[in-house]
UniProtKB/Swiss-Prot annotation:
This is Mirror-image polydactyly gene 1 protein. Residues 12-35 have a biased composition (Polar residues). PANTHER family: MIRROR-IMAGE POLYDACTYLY GENE 1 PROTEIN. Residues 1-39 are annotated as: Disordered. GO terms for molecular function: identical protein binding. It is linked to A chromosomal aberration involving MIPOL1 is found in a patient with mirror-image polydactyly of hands and feet without other anomalies (MIP). Translocation t(2;14)(p23.3;q13). MIP is a very rare congenital anomaly characterized by mirror-image duplication of digits. MIP is occasionally associated with dimelia of the ulna and fibula, tibial and/or fibular hypoplasia, nasal abnormality and other malformations. Most MIP cases are sporadic, but very rare parent-child transmissions observed in familial cases suggest an autosomal mode of inheritance. Expressed very weakly in heart, liver, skeletal muscle, kidney, pancreas and fetal kidney. Not detected in brain, placenta and lung. The keyword Transmembrane helix does not apply. Keywords: Chromosomal rearrangement, Coiled coil. The keyword Cell cycle does not apply. Residues 107-212, 253-435 form a coiled coil. GO terms for cellular component: nucleus.
Length: 442
């Protein structure tokens, strides 16, 4: 029996040494294994001691009780020993005749009990450390949750601010573009009305020229000269000469009036072209400012550069049109000067051929003026087409801005999905940390 108890203690010591060598494992696994092994070893020792007490009645019986820490309370109960000394009055000599092997077995048991107590203390300290670690992890988890909530709120606020700013910019730009388009349409309508009025006025002036003395217009200058040559009396000569002079003065006045009207019309067109150029320059400056602000807010847009190029090309075309109008004005001034020279040279009645040439020249000038007016009408049509293209560009820009707003909404949705994923991960980590229970030593 003694040899069996020694073998048990020896194997128990070997198991303890192997358990100490395996202490490099994680804290939680070590605590679980050590708790199980300690429970098993304590039961074996209690059974061993009870068996020995049954076989040796004269021997001192000892009962050991190991109390573990409860999961709710961290207080540690020390082990108590109950020594029940049973003395047999009729067999005192039997107790005196005990062998030294029994004494050594008792000392080994006491050593093992002391070792077990030390190990229990170590396990309790490790449990305390693990509880402290759990508390720290809970604090860190709460901090991370709070940070994630703050970041989510900040991102939501930023997204809301950006969307509001984009909506305001889109609304403001749309409003300005609508106003610009309406103003341009009004200008085009006014120019069209002015051109129609001028055409009507020219038609009326031509009708007036045609209706000057229709009876006298039927006669040519050659017929009037023939009448003067065939006239017998001085009264007929004076009458026919007065008719010729009156016709010349009337044609001269009509030509002067027509040239003055054309000059005033050209001056008005020049002023309108200059004002239009100034307006376009102001619009270009305003569009540049808008492009700068939009580039500061949204750097990834490149449509503004195309708009600037289109406006620059439009400005160049308008400058070229202005230069052409100025050249036409200079040409008309030169023509007026030449007409004045012709009027000063052809005051005499003897140069009938020169008068015919002058009349033909005036007719050619009328034709050229009509051609120039047709060119002006074509230029106005081109300007209307350019305005239509600008309106199409504004619509495309509006569509681009709507696409950008849609992309911003999609980005906000992606950010919300990421935040939801992070919240799910945090919930999973909480569940994992909450399900990890600590077992105590029994």
């Amino acid at each position: 029996m003694e040899n069996w108890s020694k073998d048990i203690t020896h194997s128990y010591l070997e198991q303890e040494t192997t358990g100490i060598n395996k202490s490099t494992q994680p804290d939680e696994q070590l605590t679980m294994n050590s708790e199980k092994s300690m429970h098993r070893k304590s039961t074996e020792l209690v059974n061993e001691i009870t068996c020995e007490n049954t076989e040796w009645p004269g021997q001192r019986s000892t009962n050991f009780q190991i109390i573990s820490s409860y999961p709710d309370d961290e207080s540690v109960y020390c082990t108590t020993e109950k020594y029940n000394v049973m003395e047999h009055r009729h067999n005192d000599m039997h107790y005196e005749c005990m062998t030294p092997c029994q004494v050594t077995s008792d000392s080994d048991k006491e050593k093992t009990i002391a070792f077990l107590l030390k190990e229990l203390d170590i396990l309790r300290t490790s449990n305390k450390k693990l509880q402290q670690k759990l508390a720290k992890e809970d604090k860190e988890q709460r901090k991370l949750k709070f940070k994630l909530e703050l970041q989510e709120k900040e991102t939501e606020a930023k997204i809301a601010e950006k969307t509001a700013a984009l909506v305001e910019e889109v609304y403001f730009a749309q409003k300005e573009r609508d106003e610009a388009v309406m103003s341009r349409l009004q200008l085009a309508i006014e120019e069209r009305d002015e051109a129609i009025a001028r055409a009507k006025h020219m038609e009326m002036s031509l009708k007036v020229l045609e209706n000057i003395n229709p009876e006298e217009n039927d006669m040519t200058l050659q017929e009037l000269l023939n009448r003067i040559n065939n006239a017998d009396t001085g009264i007929a000569i004076q009458k026919n000469g007065a008719i010729i002079v009156d016709r010349i003065y009337k044609t001269k006045e009509c030509k002067m009036r027509i040239t003055a009207e054309e000059m005033s019309a050209l001056i008005e067109e020049r002023d309108a072209a200059l004002s239009k150029c100034k307006r376009l320059e102001q619009e270009l400056h305003h569009v540049k400012e808008q492009n700068q602000t939009s580039a500061n807010n949204m750097r990834h847009l490149t449509a503004e550069n195309n708009q600037e190029r289109a406006l620059k090309a439009k400005l160049l075309s308008m400058q070229q049109a202005r230069e052409t109008a100025v050249q036409q004005y200079k040409k008309l001034e030169e023509e007026i000067q030449t007409l004045r020279v012709y009027y000063s040279l052809h005051k005499s009645l003897s140069q009938e051929e020169n008068l015919k040439d002058q009349f033909n020249y005036t007719l050619s000038t009328y034709e050229e003026a009509l051609k120039n007016r047709e060119n002006i009408v074509s230029i106005t049509q081109q300007q209307n087409e350019e305005l239509a293209t600008q309106l199409q560009q504004a619509l495309t820009e509006r569509a681009n801005m709507e696409l950008q707003l849609q992309h911003a909404r999609e980005a906000s949705q992606v950010a919300n999905e990421k935040v939801q994923k992070l919240e799910r991960l945090v919930d999973v980590l909480r569940k994992k940390v909450g399900t990890g229970t600590m077992r105590t030593v029994i």
